[in-house]
Every structure is written in structure tokens, then in C-alpha cells.
């Protein structure tokens, strides 16, 4: 499955069941651009097991504030609607896979 862009309006419905890795990012963020290809690979590797979602913090400030996103990229793992893990900053694919695997 491809990466899905989410907004303040549809965020809750997209994370209500299953496991998702949500990338809180912005267009002007250099490390966010660096992590994009890593997330594309994870989306392919975890198809059918976990969804990879992206939320632009500039366009969707309410959700970013709700989850206390202070630095970007911030990646939060949700399981059945609840945040269960969080990493901040660029991470290699192996680190993100390890974080996801803990919650599958």
C-alpha cells in the first residue's frame, strides 16, 4: 500500500484500528525529505501488516498539537487508535522496522 496522506479531519478514522506509523512532517523540513524514501520502503515491506501515514503539521496543526509534536519529523506508532511508540528525527529503516515490529 502506498503512503496515505491524512488531515485533521480524517486522522482519527485512519488510526482507529490496526497499526499505523504516522509521519508528522512539513514541506520545508530537510530531515523530513530525507526520511521519505525510507517510509516508501516501509510501506511496501509492511503492506497488509501496518499502514504508513503522513500528516503535514503546517496544514493540520490541531492533530500535531494533540500529540505534542514539537520537532519534526516525529513518527508515532498507533495501535487501535492509541499512540504506543514515538521517535523523533531521521531514523534508518532498520530502526523504524524494529519499532513497528514491537506492535504487530
UniProtKB/Swiss-Prot annotation:
GO biological process terms on file: cell redox homeostasis
One Pfam family from the record: Thioredoxin
Single GO MF annotation: protein-disulfide reductase activity
Disulfide bonds: 29-32
Entry keyword Disulfide bond: yes
Induction: Expressed in both aerobic and anaerobic conditions.
PANTHER family: GEO12009P1
Task performed by this protein: Component of the thioredoxin-thioredoxin reductase system. Participates in various redox reactions through the reversible oxidation of its active center dithiol to a disulfide and catalyzes dithiol-disulfide exchange reactions.
Alphabetized NCBIfam families for the sequence: thioredoxin
Family: Belongs to the thioredoxin family.
Protein name, per record: Thioredoxin
Source organism of this protein record: Staphylococcus aureus
Amino acid at each position: 500500500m502506498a503512503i496515505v496522506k491524512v488531515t485533521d479531519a480524517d486522522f482519527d478514522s485512519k488510526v482507529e484500528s490496526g497499526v499505523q506509523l504516522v509521519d508528522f512532517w512539513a514541506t520545508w523540513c530537510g530531515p523530513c525529505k530525507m526520511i521519505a524514501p525510507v517510509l516508501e520502503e516501509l510501506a511496501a515491506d509492511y503492506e497488509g501488516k501496518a499502514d504508513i501515514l503522513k500528516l503535514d503539521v503546517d496544514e493540520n496543526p490541531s492533530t500535531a498539537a494533540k500529540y505534542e509534536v514539537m520537532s519534526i519529523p516525529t513518527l508515532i506508532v498507533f495501535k487501535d487508535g492509541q499512540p504506543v511508540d514515538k521517535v523523533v528525527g531521521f531514523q534508518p529503516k532498520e530502526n523504524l522496522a524494529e519499532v513497528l515490529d514491537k506492535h504487530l
